[in-house]
Amino acid sequence: MVSPVTVVKSEGPKLVPFFKATCVYFVLWLPSSSPSWVSTLIKCLPIFCLWLFLLAHGLGFLLAHPSATRIFVGLVFSAVGDAFLIWQDQGYFVHGLLMFAVTHMFYASAFGMQPLALRTGLVMAALSGLCYALLYPCLSGAFTYLVGVYVALIGFMGWRAMAGLRLAGADWRWTELAAGSGALFFIISDLTIALNKFCFPVPYSRALIMSTYYVAQMLVALSAVESREPVEHYRLTKAN
């Protein structure tokens, strides 16, 4: 079992650019009512830094571990989704929604189907159903179906992220905690987006959405560091 102190020492320095980029976003706080390529870059910059965080572990690591590669690809789609959402008032909200739907599919695939954890799946299904029931009266037209599919996808991703979570014992792994926590923060962020867009104005919505979103993406990226594939496979691949 790797201690939290070891994790901070080994991974913390690689995350410094991400923390700096996140601070830049919140310090500048460019108005969302006036989208521009500059505001798009500033919003996407922390995600770009998470690309670099994963690449800092070596291209060989990504190529040897499909789960880490899928998280990297998910981060790429996230950045595209962020760019679309900057321009959502110009008609690109659905484009952003679709990009993040693809992101959740890549993340769920990275987290894998073992262990199955059916009880966790049932809990996530119930929570997803409650979220959709809360949003349903506010939805109309195509969003009635699009939001329903999106809720199902993020709920599935959350199930797979939390399925392997063990909080104690010799089998405890910090990357599982990172994955589960990241999924939870992602759900909070996206639920806030939906409530604010379709139902009612959420106080301080942008600060809540972006803070939980960046934390979620950081935790998901961290979960890729300790790959789900056998370590021996990576060593053999690296040696060859």
UniProtKB/Swiss-Prot annotation:
One short Pfam name that applies is: YhhN
Which parts of the sequence lie on the Extracellular side of the lipid bilayer?
A: 43, 92, 137-138, 196-206
A GO BP term, please? lipid metabolic process
Query: What catalytic reaction does the record list?
Result: a 1-O-(1Z-alkenyl)-sn-glycero-3-phosphocholine + H2O = a 2,3-saturated aldehyde + sn-glycerol 3-phosphocholine; a 1-O-(1Z-alkenyl)-sn-glycero-3-phosphoethanolamine + H2O = a 2,3-saturated aldehyde + sn-glycero-3-phosphoethanolamine
Q: Where in the cell is it found?
A: Endoplasmic reticulum membrane
What is the main EC category here? hydrolase
User: Membrane topology per the record?
Assistant: Multi-pass membrane protein
List cellular component terms (GO): endoplasmic reticulum membrane; membrane
Q: Which GO terms describe its molecular function?
A: alkenylglycerophosphocholine hydrolase activity; hydrolase activity
Question: Where, by residue number, does the polypeptide cross the bilayer?
Answer: 22-42, 44-64, 71-91, 93-113, 116-136, 139-159, 175-195, 207-227
Keywords linked to the UniProt accession? Endoplasmic reticulum, Hydrolase, Lipid metabolism, Membrane, Transmembrane, Transmembrane helix
Specify the domain of life of the species encoding this protein.
Eukaryota
Keyword Membrane recorded: yes
**InterPro entries reported for this sequence:** TMEM86B-like (IPR012506)
Q: What is its EC number?
A: 3.3.2.2
Principal subcellular localization? endoplasmic reticulum
Task: Say if the entry is tagged with keyword Cell division.
Answer: no
Family to which this protein belongs: Belongs to the TMEM86 family.
Function summary: Catalyzes the hydrolysis of the vinyl ether bond of choline or ethanolamine lysoplasmalogens, forming fatty aldehyde and glycerophosphocholine or glycerophosphoethanolamine, respectively and is specific for the sn-2-deacylated (lyso) form of plasmalogen. Plays an important role in lysoplasmalogen metabolism in the adipocyte tissue and macrophages.
What protein does this entry describe?
Lysoplasmalogenase TMEM86A
Q: Which organism is it from?
A: Homo sapiens (Human)
